Amino acid sequence: MLPRGAMLGRLPLVAQRLGARGVAAEGVPGLQCSAKTNVGKLAGALSARLREGAKTTLDSVGPAATYTAIKSIMVAEDYCSQEAQGKVLAVRPEMVKLDPRTAPSGRETQTVAFRLHVALADPLPELDQELTYMSADTNPGLAARLLVRVVEDKGVVPLACMGDKSCGIALRAIMITEEFLGRNNKLGTKALAFHAKKDTFQQGSEERVRILFQCGLVPGSLYK
């Protein structure tokens, strides 16, 4: 068993289980995020939908766009903090196939995107736990095996990410963890989600910033 504080980097491959988990229901409105999307404007649109009680999703393609989406979610939480009454934004990641695009040559291309389901939820407990560090080289399947054990034992698990690629790996690991929990009959009517926040830490003489994902089970009804 790997220690919880260990860096999960450059690990041997396990079965590559990750794939599209289904296409979102037709007619459900969603927000789009690219690498060049203005974080503040997207956060404003997201917080407006949350105030209205609407089911909210963000679609992003590629690590840079997904990183921008996560930053927008953190800013949106600040925007709606007064109305939230102590609640936080809990995010459930999913992978979906977007509508095919037709190139000028007539060839259709299929794109897979992250779809981040965002909802107001009660804060997840923060226990005295070591961080699990996610890197760009982390194997998400192997990481998920560790996360399953921690979630089953403690109920929550904190992940630390630095950069867009490590955040994308963390999202994949969270999705696979949810699948494993379902197979172990530990999910029930709940979903595995995360709350994202910035964390400043000291590394030698340098101050650095990372993103922490506090992962845990929330009511699945939040996203239905």
Locate predicted features.
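Conserved mixed alpha/beta catalytic, RNA-binding, or beta-rich assembly cores of soluble enzyme
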Residues: 29-55, 60-78, 113, 121-179
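N-terminal mitochondrial targeting presequence
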Residues: 1-26
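C-terminal edge-of-domain segments
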Residues: 82-129, 184-224
